[in-house]
Amino acid sequence: MEQFRNIGIIGRLGSVQVLETVRRLKRFLLDRHLHVILEETIAEVLPGHGLQTSSRKMLGEVCDMVIVVGGDGSLLGAARALARHNVPVLGINRGSLGFLTDIRPDELEVKCAEVLDGHYLVENRFLLQAEVRRHGEAIGQGDALNDVVLHPGKSTRMIEFEIYIDGQFVCSQKADGLIVATPTGSTAYALSAGGPIMHPKLDAIVIVPMYPHTLSGRPIVVDGNSELKIVVSKDMTIYPQVSCDGQNHFTCAPGDTITVSKKPQKLRLIHPLDHNYYEVCRTKLGWGSKLGGGGD
């Protein structure tokens, strides 16, 4: 296992609890004589920290590992910036859900010590890359760890579009939108729209229509290396939007083409050795526990 010496810290702004956890984490890492680098936005709200700082974009070039303190949204943003550097990412949960940031604040020192001592698991999570083209020219690009979503924006009208997979026409749809999700994103917006849960190790993409105006519109799971094209109808009078992880947004025009495919670089997500995906689902999604309260 890799030995981590240069540790970056990213923290969600606007939370007293996050700042408290970042301070604890900083003290813990310094006590282990590690080199700590703060992402510049969190460094600004920690006066007198005395540490090296870096932009998020450059953090992956100077760190062996990056620890994100916040919720899943914080880790999504970090993942898009860090995946291209192949730097491992560890999450400490200070959000409401914690599918990706799975270390609780009360176990920070114990779990981080295990990871730093070489006792951890690594999952490679792939991202999607999306490109919006108008008259053959790219007008917007974005990456997503969870999902790429076509939606009406501020309009309440349905969107008409065609779907192509690997150059083959699949169908036309009239719906509130379309969600294209990774296995990581299958437990996010896609799940709320009726999509299936996909194990993170699957090399697959799920396409989930949002309230389609048909009884036969259903999610479809395709190979993870597929290239998906969504063509917005030229007859549309509204300008829908494309959102990547709900954080980056692009406005489309009638006739635009949205291309979605797997990004070459992957996120290296670190978990403690006792991480159990099904336990996470059971806890976060309210699945039933063992019958009778026991048994192996």
UniProtKB/Swiss-Prot annotation:
Keyword Cytoplasm annotated: yes
A GO cellular-component term linked to this record: cytoplasm
Gene Ontology biological process terms from the UniProt entry: NAD metabolic process; NADP biosynthetic process
Residues of the active site: D72 (proton acceptor)
Enzyme class, first EC level, given as a word: transferase
Enzyme Commission code: 2.7.1.23
GO molecular function: ATP binding; metal ion binding; NAD binding; NAD+ kinase activity
Gene3D superfamilies membership: Probable inorganic polyphosphate/atp-NAD kinase, domain 1, Probable inorganic polyphosphate/atp-NAD kinase, domain 2
A Pfam family the protein falls into: NAD_kinase
Cofactor: a divalent metal cation
Keyword Cytoplasm: yes
Subcellular location per the Swiss-Prot or TrEMBL entry: Cytoplasm
Family: Belongs to the NAD kinase family.
Function: Involved in the regulation of the intracellular balance of NAD and NADP, and is a key enzyme in the biosynthesis of NADP. Catalyzes specifically the phosphorylation on 2'-hydroxyl of the adenosine moiety of NAD to yield NADP.
Name of the protein described by the UniProt record: NAD kinase
Gene of this entry: nadK
